[in-house]
Amino acid sequence: MSKFNRMHLIVLDSVGIGAAPDANNFVNAGVPDGASDTLGHISKTVGLNVPNMAKLGLGNIPREQPLKTVPAESNPTGYATKLEEVSLGKDTMTGHWEIMGLNITEPFDTFWNGFPEEILTQIEEFSGRKVIREANKPYSGTAVIDDFGPRQMETGELIIYTSADPVLQIAAHEDIIPVEELYRICEFARSITLERPALLGRIIARPYVGEPGNFTRTSNRRDLAISPFAPTVLDKLNEAGIDTYSVGKISDIFNGEGINHDMGHNKSNNHGVDNLIKAMTSEDFKHGFSFTNLVDFDALYGHRRNPQGYRDCLHEFDERLPEIIAAMKEDDLLMITADHGNDPTYAGTDHTREYIPFLAYSPSFKCSGLIPVGHFADISATIADNFGVEKAMIGESFLDKLV
């Protein structure tokens, strides 16, 4: 019998808690990540008021300098620690795959200066359409169509852009480039980005509609991912007949592998919390695991180096936390963590190599406090231990510490 009948894992995308020991091996605009500290710098520069996460023990997590505006609790209601990444990467897929038990020794490729001419030329030859070279760089998905949508409507050229993650995105106005044609072009792009020098995690079709100054992305988005290179704990749970719920982009990150209930994409963090609560309160979800990603911290504020917006986004989540806890059953376990850092006060616009926080709470807890500093994959090992399935490649369970 499982110690916890249901386990719920929430990834606060990019909410790091201080530079990892190997952070200087990773850079942002030529600056090593060694001084990065997402939560620490937000707390120090613009203040951070997250009383509900503080109650769980966020301010108790060991650091050289305590979080300036997040107090330590003398009697927290949960367990807390920080976790270190062993994989060679600081992107979304690497972080999530390691959380589910994989060690990524070959990082995906990212393209801060845009995709090489060879890739663009192959796509042009296949599609019969030119590529707008000026868009070929890391770009906000809404800004890129605002900037180049009018030109695409006139010329029929492709808008190809990337981000901090290993992705190639193609935006196309549905009246100019039909959705099915866009999908075919993306499938070709997927076929030429499966190995170095362009090993990409996802190809994303980004259809949109509207007129210049009023473009809107549609629900016809399609993600062409690659599956994890080895079974994750999600696969182990699924094979054992245990329910696995995905909220947000989790299913995309794992290419649907190991997911048997997908709650769909989130329109916002708040929408993601709504979807999580919908899953938690479903009569069908009696036993199993839910896995949620809330991406607004990263996508809207981390990459854009907006500490005030990032802080407000954290406040917004913290205000919803009591609702999540209220949806828990007595023998549920809630876990809150991250997948990498993205310090909004740091150089550049890329992710930062950081420890991630880990908070755990159950109404059944008799004790609370700190658990030893571990690694990302310890989360999946703990989940596997709880449900009596085999763990994946790496990770050590701390299930016995949660009492």
From Swiss-Prot:
Cofactor note: Binds 2 manganese ions.
Cofactor dependence: Mn(2+)
Organism domain of life: Bacteria
Keywords: Cytoplasm, Isomerase, Manganese, Metal-binding
Positions of Mn(2+) 1 binding: D13, D339, H340
Top-level class of the enzyme under EC nomenclature: isomerase
Reactions listed under catalytic activity: 2-deoxy-alpha-D-ribose 1-phosphate = 2-deoxy-D-ribose 5-phosphate; alpha-D-ribose 1-phosphate = D-ribose 5-phosphate
GO MF term (any one): magnesium ion binding
Localization per record: Cytoplasm
EC number: 5.4.2.7
Keyword Manganese listed: yes
Pathway(s) served: Carbohydrate degradation; 2-deoxy-D-ribose 1-phosphate degradation; D-glyceraldehyde 3-phosphate and acetaldehyde from 2-deoxy-alpha-D-ribose 1-phosphate: step 1/2
Gene3D superfamilies (alphabetical): Alkaline Phosphatase, subunit A, Phosphopentomutase
One Pfam family hit: Metalloenzyme
GO biological process: 2-deoxyribose 1-phosphate catabolic process; 5-phosphoribose 1-diphosphate biosynthetic process; metabolic compound salvage; nucleotide metabolic process
Major localization listed first in the record, in broad terms: cytoplasm
Positions annotated to bind Mn(2+) 2: D298, H303, H351
InterPro entries: Alkaline_phosphatase_core_sf, DeoB, Metalloenzyme, Phosphopentomutase_DeoB_cap_sf
Family of the protein in this entry: Belongs to the phosphopentomutase family.
Chain's role: Isomerase that catalyzes the conversion of deoxy-ribose 1-phosphate (dRib-1-P) and ribose 1-phosphate (Rib-1-P) to deoxy-ribose 5-phosphate (dRib-5-P) and ribose 5-phosphate (Rib-5-P), respectively.
Protein name: Phosphopentomutase
Lineage, top ranks: Bacteria, Bacillati, Bacillota, Bacilli, Lactobacillales
